[in-house]
A protein has these predicted regions:
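A glycine-rich helix N-cap at a beta->alpha junction
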Residues: 32-58
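Short amphipathic alpha-helical segments and helix-helix/interface helices
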Residues: 3, 33-37, 74
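Glycine-rich, charge-decorated loop segments at or immediately adjacent to ligand/cofactor-binding or catalytic sites
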Residues: 24-29, 55-62
């Protein structure tokens, strides 16, 4: 798994952005929750798309990261030197 492999890196990405169905990875039922919590603790900023969270009715289930607007996600992507998408 790519996300699990990130914890083996010395230098982490500045941001991980979760959109669409990927927002489910940030919920309590996700098997990746401990990995994401560790990435966040190590300094990786986790951003979760507010629109996706609302569309999937997961408002009260997000347990890691910060729920942000689509506009802010777009700003992050436009200001980044590199964007890798999975």
């Amino acid at each position: 798994n790519v996300i699990t492999g990130l914890n083996n890196l010395q230098e982490l990405p500045r941001f991980l952005i979760f959109m669409h169905e990927a927002v489910r990875l940030c919920t309590e039922s996700s098997t990746l929750l401990p990995t994401l919590q560790l990435l966040q603790k190590r300094g990786c900023s986790l951003r979760i798309c507010e629109h996706s969270v609302q569309k999937l009715s997961l408002n009260d289930e997000i347990k890691v990261g910060h729920v942000v607007s689509t506009h802010l996600i777009l700003e992050i992507c436009l200001k980044s030197e590199k964007v890798i998408r999975f």
